[in-house]
Amino acid sequence: MGFKCGIVGLPNVGKSTLFNALTKAGIEAANYPFCTIEPNTGVVPMPDPRLDALAEIVNPERVLPTTMEFVDIAGLVAGASKGEGLGNKFLANIRETDAIGHVVRCFENDDIVHVAGKIDPADDIETINTELALADLDSCERAIQRLQKRAKSGDKDAKFELSILEKILPVLENAGMIRSVALDKDELHAIKGYNFLTLKPTMYIANVNEDSFENNPYLDRVRQLAEQEGAVVVPVCAAIEAEIAELEDEEKVDFLQDLGIEEPGLNRVIRAGYRLLNLQTYFTAGVKEVRAWTVAVGATAPKAAAVIHTDFEKGFIRAEVIAYDDFIQFKGENGAKEAGKWRLEGKDYIVQDGDVMHFRFNV
């Protein structure tokens, strides 16, 4: 699995249209609030041209991309943290995701109602962020009450956790984001179990009309806000994505060329998600399968091996490694070996994006 991204936004911003396009799940995308009731989940293959290039050389029995999971959360409204709209249940669903994709409406269309009666991306973002902060505030206050008793009895872990929660409490009281608080590695690890919503990496998916990727004041405003937060912005046109999703691969290429677009918005969303979560891809390439795997940037070879199977990490001996560019240039493993580009790496090796790897292990 690549990662799980919860798609949030106000009702009628294009959330479900985008989700349908990304996953071809075909859930209802009606023009009225709350048409998403249970969270819909879709697993999407990660588009990566490198995988096809490797497969052309190796000619395997099958090709397996890595994947990304999208969860379409019902449209949030002001008061969701207090049970308004469809309430707390949906905030709980977001907690289970690794990142948040916040869909923001950056287009005008009189036929599609806006829940607030006007198009104002800054206001929309504030509404959602406030609800997420209020939900975190509730969790934080309850955790503080629980921890105070343990901290008084001398529990060191409880004292440490309490000190972190007391640091983030005033930020949440002002509807701020926990991710704006400077927390070190140990502090982040200590509060990981709370799954705080405002700590999750966030990207803004700006839903625009097909002719308003440029010179769009709504999009400019989202970019301005995202820059202040250190968040990523991905402009897409959900309506175009919905059309692309219905086409065969060859038709897609022609359709994109006609529109002057290089690739579907899905690719941009996934790449942004990868950057957001500090992820990268490595490959395994054999006659049975050529496959992409997702690991964290900075992962060691044994950690990369564990993605395939935990036994690979436990019994790790060495990793055979060829850089992707070398594998392509020298037409596979044998050519790379002859060119001196095949190498053996130990347990401290830091995996690089695109590495073609084979693990030696003994259990």
Swiss-Prot record:
Instruction: Provide the residue positions that the database annotates as binding Mg(2+).
Output: S16, T36
Q: What is its biological role?
A: ATPase that binds to both the 70S ribosome and the 50S ribosomal subunit in a nucleotide-independent manner.
Annotated keywords: ATP-binding, Magnesium, Metal-binding, Nucleotide-binding
Q: Which gene encodes it?
A: ychF
Q: Name one GO molecular function term.
A: metal ion binding
Name the NCBIfam families on file.
Answer: redox-regulated ATPase YchF (TIGR00092)
Can you say what this protein is called? Ribosome-binding ATPase YchF
What range(s) does the TGS domain occupy? 278-361
| GO cellular component labels | cytoplasm
Q: Where is the OBG-type G domain?
A: 3-256
What InterPro entries does the database record attribute to this sequence?
ATPase_YchF/OLA1, Beta-grasp_dom_sf, G_OBG, GTP-bd, P-loop_NTPase, TGS, TGS-like, TGS-like_dom_sf
Organism expressing this protein natively: Haemophilus ducreyi (strain 35000HP / ATCC 700724)
Where does this protein hold ATP? Answer: N12, V13, G14, K15, S16, T17
The protein's required cofactors? Mg(2+)
Top-level taxon of the source organism: Bacteria
Identify its protein family.
Belongs to the TRAFAC class OBG-HflX-like GTPase superfamily. OBG GTPase family. YchF/OLA1 subfamily.
